[in-house]
Amino acid sequence: MSNINAKTGKQFIIIIDEWDVLIRDEAAEFEVQDEYINFLRGLFKGTEPMKYIGLAYITGILPIKKLKTQSALNNFDEYTMLDAGELAGYIGFTQDEVKTLCTEYGADFEKVKHWYDGYRLGDYHIYNPKAVVSVVTKRLFQSYWSQTGSYETIIPLISKNFDGLKNAIIEMLSGDMVKVDTGTFQNDAVNFSNRDDIITYLIHLGYLAYDEKCKCAYIPNEEVRQELLKATRQKKWKEFIEFEKQSDNLLDSTLDMDNKKVSEIIEKIHMEYASVIKYNDENSLSSVLTIAYLSSMKYYFTPIRELPAGRGFADFVYLPKPEYTDFYPALVIELKWNKNVRTALEQIKQKQYPKSLLSYTGDILIVGIIYDKKDKVHKCEIERYEK
């Protein structure tokens, strides 16, 4: 290229699609990867390539691999799922584009949004184009993920024995966000040193979304949630399978208005998933509720947070999905400490009616759960709400 440029005076435009195939598919072949990275560095690094390359455009799932803490090709501008910059509106379909398609094809936008929205890049809500096109043409609300990627690739990742990884996955499956430090990830599929590296990789793969403002990861939508659930039900995730049974029992007991059983299960989950240090921390209250009611995600939307944690309570509203409104009531659940269980229920009633339920016409259960900070005993009382 240098010789051609010297003779013609013309520069090259180089386009490489899926630059990271060797990084992902040959993850254990370190010599192959080193040779490949050195080839790219020879092609793009230094002042000489600037003479004969007018533009280089490289696409892939992963950012450019790091050598120690620096990018192997630091003369590129990178746009990623962590920071899409000015390209944010071009990485997928924007919400306005999806609304237009829904109008054109007569699809229910709110349902499309629930299933396929969730990625936040800059000021944009970004949707997976493959999923949107499939749902508006086929009229089937389901996961189209398996047609563009395999969940089997993440089973070894989420099965790694990093402290806090499995709990973080369960929290996100329950609808919560988890804090993540994306800075240590080496941008490859091998050098994972902690749970944050795994979570960052899953963000780049699209299985998780990233909130840049609060530095948190979360599951973006129902489609991706379905795929992650498939992965967590594999044999290596025996702990999750057991936990899911426990959560199933909790939801059934709540719907049966079995106060004693709900108290026992919540207490057990609180003991298992809140460390001794954080057991009485206000912020752990929300995690206890969302984790405990993980199984509700089959029939309910992601829980709506009505009140902030930090004052000794956590308040959530669970609305059933449209296809389940005839069979499942809405749930208003409040967890408080050092209070009388009747007080918890009365406060739910006395508060201004939750905004998220104003237009809801189905049955409603209000669930008051309290625990004592000293003896850690939980109590529960459930009532059917009369409008």
Features from the language model and the residues they span:
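Phosphate-binding site recognition
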Residues: 1-281
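Active-site metal-binding core of divalent-cation-utilizing nuclease and nuclease-like domains
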Residues: 3-8, 297-326
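Switch/connector loops and helix/strand junctions flanking conserved nucleotide-binding motifs
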Residues: 22-24, 65-71, 341-344, 374-381
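Mg2+/Mn2+-dependent nuclease catalytic core
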Residues: 33-39, 337-354
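Metal-dependent nuclease catalytic cores in nucleic-acid-processing enzymes
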Residues: 42-50, 200-208, 290-295, 347-367
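Acidic-basic catalytic patches of nuclease active cores, encompassing PD-(D/E)XK
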Residues: 271-303
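Conserved catalytic cores of phosphodiester-cleaving nucleases, focusing on short active-site segments
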Residues: 289, 314-318, 328-339, 351
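Domain-level recognition of nuclease-like catalytic cores that cleave nucleotide substrates
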Residues: 356, 362-387
